[in-house]
């Protein structure tokens, strides 16, 4: 399943500056694994040491927040859009 992944500015160093990349995978976990295969180092910025989504990174498949779906097992149908959005904090 080919999906379009929108890459935030802070992670574009891993994608050669590309704002969008294509990835394969039937689930979000598969998409992240494919991203890592083609853009080494990006998975460590999205996943923690236990392989779970980092607390301050929001991921959407189409318009659905995966935290309220099936997490890393959320289906990524062909043609879906995946958005990686790091939380912004300030004080």
What residue spans do the PLM features occupy?
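Ubiquitin-like/PB1-type beta-grasp interaction modules and other compact soluble beta-rich domains
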Residues: 1-90
